[in-house]
Every structure is written in structure tokens, then in C-alpha cells.
Amino acid sequence: MATHERKTIDLEQGWEFMQKGITKLKNILEGKPEPQFSSEDYMMLYTTIYNMCTQKPPHDYSQQLYEKYRESFEEYITSMVLPSLREKHDEFMLRELVKRWSNHKVMVRWLSRFFHYLDRYFISRRSLPQLSEVGLSCFRDLVYQEIKGKVKSAVISLIDQEREGEQIDRALLKNVLDIFVEIGLTSMDYYENDFEDFLLKDTADYYSIKAQTWILEDSCPDYMLKAEECLKREKERVAHYLHSSSEQKLLEKVQHELLTQYASQLLEKEHSGCHALLRDDKVDDLSRMYRLFSRITRGLEPVSQIFKQHVTNEGTALVKQAEDAASNKKPEKKEIVGLQEQVFVRKIIELHDKYVAYVTDCFQGHTLFHKALKEAFEVFCNKGVSGSSSAELLATFCDNILKKGGSEKLSDEAIEDTLEKVVRLLAYISDKDLFAEFYRKKLARRLLFDKSANDEHERSILTKLKQQCGGQFTSKMEGMVTDLTVARDHQAKFEEFISTHSELNPGIALAVTVLTTGFWPSYKSFDINLPAEMVKCVEVFKEFYQTRTKHRKLTWIYSLGTCNINAKFEAKTIELIVTTYQAALLLLFNGVDRLSYSEIVTQLNLSDDDVVRLLHSLSCAKYKILSKEPNNRSISPNDVFEFNSKFTDKLRRLKIPLPPVDEKKKVVEDVDKDRRYAIDASIVRIMKSRKVLGHQQLVMECVEQLGRMFKPDFKAIKKRIEDLITRDYLERDKDNPNVYRYLA
């Protein structure tokens, strides 16, 4: 069988053929008239290389062809590309460079195809750089290295022109900068070292000069508008022609020059800085300030400090305003928490609403500003007004909203909203236990004297308080509200009992409210000498109650009772609504016309203070049911009283007020007592788990445990520790008196 021998191609002959193809390619690239490569042309060129590489040695020309491949590029670059670049400058040079780079990539693509066989076998066996890589490195080493400096300067010059507002060819810049990236193949080193570093330095210089002028000439809002616009423009620059990896570095440079360098000068500008923006409610400018300063490291800290100071000043001014208004009150009204204080709480709520909105909207709910707001409110929310603590003021404010006929006339929705806001303010008050006690006293009055406007609101605020302060805070109050519901049921059963035991009917309509001792504030229970009619009522109810339960003891709190009595005056009979104490005193005059002060005290068996209050309400106040000798405005032990039969009034039904005893002192005393117990319990709890602990640490843990309800005084804790030592709960360490041991 005959074999077909392939004709050997020698190097010169083969390369001459290849040269023709390469020249044709160069002509096409230079735009000279030349027909495109046909598939036959391509196959001929490819096959020539293939044959020259697969001939038996010494005619395998792979190594020589690999070198000639490189030389083809070097020759073309030296003869055509570099001269055309060297004769052009600035933008024209950049355009030429883009064209030349584009052509070069086409040339690499075509030549790599012609020489493809080298890539597949020769190169991989010898671990040599691939053809495309060789082609690119020729451009890098010969063209790029020579003109990179001029290119970088031309590009940066155009960028600065654009910064000054001139129109530039962004597409051209994008194409030029793509060369810096593509030259590095997979590495960004060329882009970063030969262009980006210079751009960043130029950017810093450019904005440094701008900032020096603007900080002197512009107001803070105008400066910020310019800074924001610059940052926006630089971001656009990245999107249009810089590499995305430059964005962060570029913006940081701009931020550093425009913001970091001038932060304090900008924030503290006299008539337009942060203080002024807060004072004038410039919310858009404050939002911009937040956006800008949140970009720089620790940039928001000074802003939040100024915000805190501003809110503190505003709140403190409200306290002073309320103090001034209170000091202008008449002396006898100073003790009563009145309308002025209500206005104060309302203003504090409005202040809180305003600055919570600032934190949310201007400062995007950032924790620094939440903290600043909290710390500011803690400063002035714990200042009292004319002897009333903020705990009392808040409790009184709630009372006014929740009681019938309070000074706050609001819709149901507005009431809910306001209560929500009061509970939020409570978070800033350190003496939450004091608020709880005042609130409980006032809740008791609302519930017991049917003053509560709406049960739903009463329960709703307790739910809010529970969420804010925990279940322990509201458990007693919830018990009080529940007691009233149970008491109504008791009353219905009592009325049923009377109707089935008519012989026990006392002849007086009697309503009794049974309360659970632990839930309610403590009240004094005096053994007042009740009139016979009332004694009978008490006995009948006792008998009924014993049919319901055997193990519960009733303690009667007559000081909280009310009574309706008919008083027959000469002109007409008037129904008087009085307290049980007032009724007991008036009923003494059913049998006699005149009674001396001392006789009244003896017959009622009450304290002098109580009797003076009662007599004052009936003989010296608006409705003089009793007349007294001497006829003056104060009660003394030598006075004599008689029923004023001449009394009359246009109404047939009168409520005779009895001014309440000032409960403030009692509330504070009760809270102090509870605090002592709470500190004791906390110390014992801590020591029980720790067994041995130093004084300082015990105090700190105690403060932390109790901080949710009140701020315990260090001296008070020390005192309680001493007391627990004397009661053998703790002992001092023998070697170190500053260390305590728990005694089981």
C-alpha cells in the first residue's frame, strides 16, 4: 500500500507566506483598502503553522515561530503604533491610544488563531506564557510603560475640568481607564499604582482648596449642600468611567477634606451650626448633617452631644418656667398640684414628641441619638417643680385625664395616645416606685369615690405600665381594679340578702366596698363612735359577710365612706352629701342644739386634727351648716357650735367638701419604708448566691438590681448592710473588714 509523503516546509519559505497574512491584517487595522480574510485564507495560514510545527526534527519550527509571533507585534508597535502616539497630546493622544489598544486586541485575537496550534501543544508542554498573554505584554512593555505618565496626567486634568463644571467625553475616559485594568489581566496593580494613587492625591488637593474657601464664606447649611453635591458627583464619576473599586477610596478622600478636617468648625458655626439648626427647627439641614457625618468615623458623636445639650436646655427652661409660675401662686395654694403643673407635663410630652420625631426622621433612629435623648430627658425629668417631684406630677397628670370632670377634655383616642406618652416619660424617671405609690393613691380615690371616667382606660394604662416596668410594678394596681368588680358582685348579693331577711333591714340604703388589704394603700382605721343608725348597718353587713366566708376579718375604714343625709332647715330640706365622719358629727346635733369643741371630740372619739378639719368644713367654709362662736375662720378648743337652722341655698342637693389630708408626706414615708425592705431583700439575694463579696461590688450589684424602680442612695445601702450584720444575715470578714460573708 502506497504512503503519501508530506512536503517539508522550511522556515524562510513558511514565514514568508505567514508574513503576507500578517501584512494583510495590519493593512485592515490601519484602515487601508484590503479585502477581509476568507475562510480559505484563514485555513491556509493555520495549516501552514500546523505543518511547520508537526514536521520531524530538525524541521519542527515551534520555538522559532513562537519567537516570530512576538516579533510581529514588536515590529508593528515600533513602526506604526508608537510614532502615531508620540505625535499627539492630551485628549487627541487619549483617542489614539484607545484606537490603538482596540486594534491591538484584534491583532492578538487573529494572530492567536493563526498560531493556535502552538497554544495547544508547544506552549502547554513547555509551560510558556500563552499567545494572547504574549500579545498583551508586548503592548504593555512597549506602549503602556512609555506613555502611562502622560495618560494619567491627561485623564486627571479632564476629571478636574469636569469638577469645575466643564463637559468632557466620559466614554473616552471610560475606555482609557479600561486599558489600565485590562493591562493587568487579573491584577488591579497597574490601575491602582499608575492611576488611582495619583487621582486620590489630586482629589485630596482639589477639595482641600475648595474647603478652605467654603468654610470661611458659606453658612453651615450651604457648605453641607455643596459637600453633599460633591459626594454625589464623585459617585457618578465612578459609575461613568472609574473602576468600581475606586468608589470607597475616592469618597473617603472627599469626606476627609470636606468633613473630617472641618467637622468642629462646621458644627459650631455661630449663626448656622448645629445649635442654630436645632433652635430653628431646620429638619432638612439636620437630616443632611446626619447623612454627611454618619459617613465619617465617630462623626456623629459631636452631633449627638450638641443634640443632647440642646434638648437638656429646652427641658430645663420648661422646668424653670414652671418653677416661676409656681412661685407666683398664692401661698395657701402652693401645696396643691394645679393647672400650671399640668401645663408643664403637657409641654414635656410635646417636647418629647418633637425630639423623638427628630431622632426617627432626621437621625434615622441611630442609637447615639436615642441615647442622647434619654440622657437629656433624665436630667430635667428628675427635677421637681415647687416641691412636687416629677413622679407626683406625672401621677397627677394621669389622674386628671382618667377622672370624671378632670381638666383634660380629650377624646378616647387622644386619652390612649396621651397615656402612652406619659408611660414613655416614666422611663426617664429614676423614682418609679414613688410614681407607683402616688398613682396608687389617686387610683384608689378614683375607684372608691366613683371618679373614674372609664374602666377601659384604667386597664389600658396598667397594661402599658406593665410592659414598661414589669408585672411587679402593676400587680397591686391590677388587684385594686379587680377588687372593685368583685365588690359590685358582693353588693348585689348583700342587697339580695336584705330582701330575703327583711327583719335585718337597717332602714338605710347601705353600700359596702370590700377590699383586699395587700392591694390598697394603707389607711388609718379609727374607732370612731358611730351613730346608732350606722352601728346597726355595720352589724347587718357583718352578719351577711359571715355567711359568705368564715376566715376573713373585716377592718372598717370609715374615713373613706360617704353618706347622704337630709337636713331640715327653716327655709327647706336640703340633701347633704358628706363623708361618714362629717355625717357622724352632724348627727350629734339631732339631740342637742349646742356643743362645745371638747364635747364633740369626746363624743366622736377622733383625733384633734381630724375634728378641726371636720368642723372647719362645716362651719368656716362655703356651706356653713354649723354656726360657731366666736365667728372667725379658725377652729380653737374654746369654740362652741350649733346647728345653723337659718342656712339655705338655691340647690336642693349639696356636696360638702372635706379637703383631703396632704398625702405627699405619707406617700414619701411609705416609699422610704418599702425601699428599705427592697434594699434588704436585694442584699440578701446577692449574698446568698455569691456567699462572699467586697463592699464596693455588693453596692454596685445592689444599685443595678434596684435601678429599674429607684436609684438607691449609697449611704442607705451602707446603713442596710450594717443593719443586716446586726441581725446576723451577714458578717464582716475577719481579715478584711471591706468584705462580707453570708450567714445561712
Swiss-Prot record:
MF GO annotations: ubiquitin protein ligase binding
PTM per Swiss-Prot/TrEMBL: Neddylated (rubylated). Deneddylation occurs upon interaction with the COP9 signalosome (CSN) complex.
Induction note: Induced by abscisic acid, heat shock, salt stress and drought stress.
Superkingdom per UniProt: Eukaryota
Annotated tissue distribution: Expressed in dry seeds and coleoptiles.
Cullin neddylation domain residues: 674-736
Pfam family, one: Cullin_Nedd8
Record-level GO BP terms: protein ubiquitination; ubiquitin-dependent protein catabolic process
Keywords: Ubl conjugation, Ubl conjugation pathway
One GO CC term, this protein: cullin-RING ubiquitin ligase complex
Quaternary context: Part of a SCF (SKP1-CUL1-F-box protein) E3 ubiquitin-protein ligase complex. Is able to form the SCF complex together with SKP1 and the rice black streaked dwarf virus RBSDV protein P7-2. Interacts with D3.
Stated family: Belongs to the cullin family.
Function, as annotated: Involved in ubiquitination and subsequent proteasomal degradation of target proteins.
UniProt protein name: Cullin-1
Gene it is expressed from: CUL1
